[in-house]
Amino acid sequence: MGAVATAAASYNRILGANDRLRIGAIGTGQRCQYLLSLLNKIGSNDIVAVCDVYEPHRLEAKAKFAPDANDYVHSEDLLERKDIDAVVIGAPDHWHVPLILAAVRAGKDVYCEKPVTHRIEEGPPLIAAVQESKRIVQTGTQQRSWEHYRNAKALIDGGVLGKITFVRTYWYQNHFANQQSGPPIDTSKLDWRRFLGTAPYRPFNHDQYAHWRWYWDFGGGAMTDLFVHWVDVAQWFTGNDMPTRATACGSKFLLPERQTPDTMSAALLYPSVLVEFDSTLLGYIEGGGLMFRGTKAAMRLHRRGFAVYDELPAYSESYEPDVAVLEAKSTHDGTIDHMRNFLECVQSRNTPNAPVEVGVAAARAGHVANFALRGNGVWMPPQQKA
């Protein structure tokens, strides 16, 4: 691994405190384009290169956010540029680890969308490679930088909730209608084989390209998409990062032609807390969030804010007090704070709020839930199995 560190060092551009960072973007679909818009709002950087296997995506990103940027089909061509300090990765999940490894070996710092891994076994070697390279890697669990989440954690650390034994997480999206179709894809402008990467070859399939997250070769469904956000918060707040047991079930009630379930539930047991997750593509009532239950109080937490409710002194049929004893509202999307934290750490070389170790632990929980889901409904660590 020493060669990796040496190679990375030879690529580094020496940055001064006031230098504008030079950024490249890989996988410039909808999410990455949003991240590019935030980079422009922050303004301490220049987007100098964009890369995507689909020409309309990269040209759209260039036109909207970086008219003077060079555009590339192959990430290798972008990464070999010695004038690029950092890359933002928004490619499908199965490309995350290969791209992170290539980037840090080329001396680039990395902001990568979650889940940081596509397979659970990718985690340890990824951590080792990033640590050896000395590069900054921020993973896209933006709650780690979102002010009201950080304030909520401070309350929990201060004992406001007492001993927490149960966390319910949920994410309901009214996305069923959006999943039925998508814009046409001009296959003459798509490098399909490049999109497949390490996945087995198959002829072009519109749904697998447009909705790749719902196919096992490219993503992990809601467990490694939505659940990863919330389980990361649960692990962060409770100090747990390794489940000891998991159960899960789910089905394809809405989209039977896909591979991953559209309706599911999971429960992960940790040494000091039980974390549950349920999700479906219907009914946006409640949206997504978490409920922490402790011996002194309960906390409802989501992207719009949080509220704390004192525990009742005796049993009551009143399931929720009318008035929260503590409440906070969020004023903006914390992704911009997460990106700003990344850019500041590129300059300072401090550890970011969601380093690779955090990203691997969050993704691991999603993988464990999928093991239970795809197996007999139960997962235990190998050493615990009979």
Question: Model-predicted segments: where are they?
Answer:
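Beta-strand-loop-alpha-helix segment that lines the small-molecule cofactor/substrate pocket
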Residues: 92, 97-145, 159
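Catalytic nucleophile loop
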Residues: 32, 96, 230
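Contiguous beta-strand/loop segments that form the cofactor/metal-binding neighborhood of enzyme cores
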Residues: 150-151, 163, 168, 175-213, ...
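Conserved SAM-binding strand-loop segment of SAM-dependent methyltransferases
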Residues: 69-74
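N-terminal Rossmann-like NAD(P) cofactor-binding module of classical short-chain dehydrogenase/reductase
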Residues: 86-88
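N-terminal Rossmann-like dinucleotide-binding module
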Residues: 2-65, 143-146, 234
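Short glycine/serine/threonine-enriched helix-capping/active-site loop
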Residues: 138-141, 166-170
